[in-house]
Curated annotation (Swiss-Prot):
A Pfam family hit: GTP-eEF1A_C
EC number: 2.7.7.4
Gene3D superfamilies membership: P-loop containing nucleotide triphosphate hydrolases, Translation factors
Positions of region (G5): 206-208
Protein's name according to its UniProt entry: Sulfate adenylyltransferase subunit 1
Domain tr-type G: 25-239
Single GO biological process annotation from the record: sulfate assimilation
Alphabetical keyword list: ATP-binding, GTP-binding, Nucleotide-binding, Nucleotidyltransferase, Transferase
Pathways per UniProt: Sulfur metabolism; hydrogen sulfide biosynthesis; sulfite from sulfate: step 1/3
Family membership: Belongs to the TRAFAC class translation factor GTPase superfamily. Classic translation factor GTPase family. CysN/NodQ subfamily.
G2: region residues: 92-96
Length: 475
């Protein structure tokens, strides 16, 4: 057993008391990103090692793995703690997003270790979508690279406001203050073009040697700031969704017997209480909240991020994908929107194409009306393009098959985030963040009914020799 964990349990007076204490700790989700070989996996391994979160059998296995797959000679290769795929260990790189969990006396953490290779940028975007802070690693020998800029832009695009720039491998530049200062100035020059109000911090460190990771480095007396762990433990995270109006997307209708009918899902933003008047969109029907059912029993009030089942006073027609909000709020349905897109497929995104769209439990179809621009990651300039290639990032105009209730992604990631799904292969090919919904007055209405479009898709899928045209794509 982990001796630190055993000591913590003993200090709390038993397992039950320790678990209660864990529930009251704040949780920080963060990711590590940067260019390939900047030391992301090694940094996470060092954090786990120096906070003594590794079990004895894991440490023994790490010693053996370091001899077989390690790249650090006689030293422990801490990157092997998170590089779990065989291909990752053989190549010495991260391919998939690896999640790790650890806690200190002050906070709980969920880490997403994301790939650095450009071809795995889509994996990085996936990891960033649920995080509140990003650690951007920079190799002190190389400085700010294209992938550093790319990952910085994607992180801010996905709503991350806290960036920790970890200038790694300081041991390979003799712990030079001049090198640290130069890289910091280079990054700040670039960061001035990033959108939003950002909290940017810089930490010089060596993940391999442990300098400024969990303890202060004696090799860099010129740095008097916080260690990386201290930054993670003390950064104040203000969730945007807490201050936003109530949004409750219905995931499914919970009807275990004839006496109970509830609507299950996660409260995306705001708060809801028993007796509150709510409105169902897109129907516009209103009712009152009779009960709020949770895993721990009925509650009088719940807040954003909690999984709940709402029971209403009236028997009304509600299905998966519908949205509940405060009755006094006017939120019109829209049929068009401009969307920031991270494209994840080999086949480029082009105007005229149509895809299945999934947003907050709702699935519908959308047509690409046009691509306004693609962002040049090197300097964040916008350039006109005919299509959006793999790993491309740009602003796209979409028209949906039916009216949808949308928020801007920066206001509400749940009701403003969507994915593109290929209609034939059912593969996720892109991620979208609603930039601006277009009012219903200017949105184009669909020429065909949902039944006609579904029938058209089935005919083209099963009888391609008939040569039926794509109704949504050809409009």
């Amino acid at each position: 057993m982990n001796t630190v964990l055993a000591q913590q349990i003993a200090n709390e007076g038993g397992v039950e008391a320790w678990m209660i204490a864990q529930q009251h700790k704040s949780l920080l989700r963060f990711l590590t990103c940067g260019s390939v070989d900047d030391g992301k996996s090694t940094l996470i391994g060092r954090l786990l090692h120096d906070t003594r979160q590794i079990y004895e059998d894991q440490l023994s296995s790490l010693h053996n793995d370091s001899k077989r797959h390690g790249t650090q000679g006689e030293k422990l290769d801490l990157a092997l703690l998170v590089d779990g795929l065989q291909a990752e260990r053989e190549q010495g790189i991260t391919i998939d997003v690896a999640y790790r969990y650890f806690s200190t006396e002050k906070r709980k953490f969920i880490i997403a270790d994301t790939p650095g290779h450009e071809q795995y940028t889509r994996n990085m975007a996936t990891g960033a979508s649920t995080c509140e802070l990003a650690i951007l690693l920079i190799d002190a020998r190389k400085g700010v690279l294209d992938q550093t800029r790319r990952h910085s832009f994607i992180s801010t695009l996905l709503g991350i406001k806290h960036l920790v720039v970890a200038i790694n491998k300081m041991d390979l530049v003799d712990y030079s203050e001049e090198t640290f200062t130069r890289i910091r100035e280079d990054y700040l020059t670039f960061a001035g073009q990033l959108p939003g109000n950002l909290d940017i911090r810089f930490v010089p460190l060596s993940a391999l040697e442990g300098d400024n990771v969990a303890s202060q480095s004696e090799s860099m007396p010129w740095y008097s700031g916080l260690t990386l762990l201290e930054v993670l433990e003390t950064v104040e995270i203000q969730r945007v969704v807490d201050a936003q109006p109530m949004r409750f997307p219905v995931q499914y209708v919970n009807r275990p017997n004839l006496d109970f009918r509830g609507y299950a899902g996660m409260l995306a933003s705001g708060r809801v209480e028993v007796g509150q008047r709510v409105k169902v969109l897109p129907s516009g029907v209103e009712s009152n909240v009779a009960r709020i059912v949770t895993f721990d029993g009925d509650r009088e009030e719940v807040f954003a991020g909690e999984a709940i089942t709402l029971v209403l006073t009236d028997e009304i027609d509600i299905s998966r994908g519908d949205l509940l909000l405060a009755a006094d709020e006017a939120l019109p349905a829209v049929q068009s929107a401009s969307v920031d897109v991270v494209w994840m497929a080999e086949q480029p995104l082009s105007p005229g194409q149509s895809y299945d769209i999934k947003i907050a439990g709702k699935k519908t179809r959308a047509r690409v009306d046009g691509i306004r621009y693609q962002v040049d990651i090197n300097n964040l300039t916008q350039r006109e393009v005919e299509n959006l290639p793999l790993n491309g990032i740009g602003l796209v105009d979409l028209t949906f098959d039916e009216p949808l209730v949308l928020d801007r992604y920066q206001q509400n990631p749940v009701t403003g985030g969507l994915i593109f799904i290929d209609r034939l292969s059912n593969v996720t090919v892109g991620a979208g963040m609603v930039h601006e919904p277009v009012s219903q007055a200017t949105a184009a209405s669909s020429e065909f009914s949902a039944f006609e479009l579904e029938l058209n898709a089935l005919v083209r899928r099963h009888f391609p020799h008939w040569g039926a045209r794509d109704l949504l794509g050809d409009k």
